[in-house]
């Protein structure tokens, strides 16, 4: 005779899994958009591409996680924004290629299925999807006792977007003389946290460091990653942008060259970069070499645009936010990124 409790005895709570599905339905409903087909719970998410109105559609996809920022979410028991980080990391990548996000899927793996906690995680994913204009059309929650500790979980996501074939941004339009515009980040975003955790390993998170302008350390460290989709899409539609770099792991040095050809370089005026207080604190308390900061972090610029000089004012007008002219594209001599 089959023991009905056998799976539970091995550490997998099927009933908790059902509860998670019920809890997240209202959050998923917030992300509904034209093109979504079917309901949550099917074997595959469906999307009608014809509803986008794109004449020559090219699908662009991206996948990412949030790295060890998750460890701070677990440490501080704050799980309602880490999902936004996951969405941001994916959709900011595909917007850099000129794609409008259409839909998103998430994957959560955990040692113990705690419905209330996982609802918070998915609520954050849904909020990110709303900000990106993407539908959350599916996902997976895997309870994996023995693989993860009871309080541990991992989170990854997958975004799919669409671009008009003629509006794809692949770096081929970036030329010498283009102006580099920086869009401010919300903070560290979701990269460099192995170093961040080492720097602040002996802190509780409740500290209010003088550099952080009255905010608690944990609030600054868990500030969700900014989603740039709604700010940048109008620029793409008007074909005002030649190149876009999402400044993630590897900072300026690794990511900026990804938006132009090998014979070009980015010359950046450091005095024009809007360095956020958290980066000054990290450099000070971590005793990190100043030049290395630009090899690791976004330094206050989460997205960089390469724009023809004649389009700069129109771009600023459409963005309607602080936009920083931080440099220009030059002919490459030695380095791909020159910070002066």
UniProtKB/Swiss-Prot annotation:
Enzyme Commission code(s) on record: 6.3.3.1
Domain of life: Bacteria
Coiled coil: none
Any one of the GO CC terms: cytosol
Catalytic class of the enzyme: ligase
Subcellular locations according to the entry: Cytoplasm
Similarity comment: Belongs to the AIR synthase family.
Protein name: Phosphoribosylformylglycinamidine cyclo-ligase
Annotated source species: Streptococcus pneumoniae (strain ATCC BAA-255 / R6)
